[in-house]
């Protein structure tokens, strides 16, 4: 009775029923994964050059060596090679997005969307490397979720803190230590919330998610909507975006953007719509927050 009732409900909803058949095996040729790998390691070398401009030869040779290792691994253990390349892309492109030429744009809008486009390029590389039947049906999946959420933040903080090394030899007020402790606790909470088996979601957040899904069909990700993208707006409207301390928060949105496309079993159109909603509404929330702050100062 249960199966008959379920079948009737599915048919009323517009679904057709029939005999279950296995998916045909499909995998792109290794050459396409190799091309994607070359692009990923080129981006990694470019970011390394930005971090260490006086180590140009080392950065370039490191990129070539990493690509060679990836090609060998692609022949020996193709799934591991794909997962490794996708992880590198998920780490590098959010960082690269916040170090790009878009900062030289004159308007906040162009700066904002330039960063998003670099991250979308990273998402494209993730999709290219994670293609294949076993990944599409989730028999295998993206590995390194927590690394992809932590390493970009650490790299962005490193780039901002490098000019401040002299502070290590100075007396630090207690209030700064308290702020650092609170930031550390927030970081622990952030890491524990990542992945499929993190901290449980609060009931209020569940209700908010359901409301957005009913309203928009696909809800934007919370980290992008309420945290990352508004922070990106704040950073991009500053006089020196590349030095803004909003960037460690802004990169969370770029990480989440790329991470959306690691869920390769999800329809690409759904991931694109979700990303667009997050970028649009995040920008609007950032703009509204600035206007509210300016109004409050008056």
Predicted features, each with a name:
Residues 1-27:
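Soluble extramembrane regions of membrane proteins in the secretory/endomembrane system
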């Amino acid at each position: 009775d249960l199966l008959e009732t379920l079948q009737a409900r599915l048919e009323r909803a517009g679904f057709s029923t029939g005999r279950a058949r296995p998916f045909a095996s499909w995998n792109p040729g290794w050459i396409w994964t190799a091309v994607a790998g070359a692009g990923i390691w080129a981006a990694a070398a470019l970011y390394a050059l930005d971090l260490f401009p006086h180590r140009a030869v080392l950065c370039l040779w490191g990129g070539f060596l990493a690509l060679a290792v990836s090609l060998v691994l692609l022949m020996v253990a193709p799934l591991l090679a794909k997962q490794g390349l996708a992880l590198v892309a998920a780490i590098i492109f959010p960082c690269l997005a916040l170090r790009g030429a878009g900062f030289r744009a004159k308007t906040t809008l162009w700066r904002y969307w330039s960063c998003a486009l670099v991250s979308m390029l990273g998402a494209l590389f993730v999709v290219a490397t994670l293609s294949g039947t076993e990944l599409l049906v989730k028999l295998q999946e993206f590995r390194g979720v927590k690394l992809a959420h932590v390493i970009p933040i650490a790299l962005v903080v490193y780039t901002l803190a490098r000019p401040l090394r002299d502070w290590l030899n100075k007396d630090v007020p207690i209030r700064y230590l308290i702020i650092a402790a609170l930031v550390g606790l927030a970081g622990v909470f952030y890491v524990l919330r990542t992945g499929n088996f993190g901290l449980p979601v609060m009931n209020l957040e569940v209700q908010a998610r359901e409301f957005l899904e009913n309203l928009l069909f696909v809800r934007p990700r919370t980290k992008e909507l309420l945290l990352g993208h508004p922070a990106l707006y704040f950073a991009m409207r500053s006089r020196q975006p590349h030095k803004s301390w909003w960037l460690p928060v802004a990169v969370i949105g770029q990480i989440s953007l790329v991470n959306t496309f690691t869920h390769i079993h999800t329809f690409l159109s759904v991931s694109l719509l979700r990303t667009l909603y997050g970028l649009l509404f995040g920008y609007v929330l950032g703009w509204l927050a600035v206007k509210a702050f300016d109004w409050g100062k008056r």
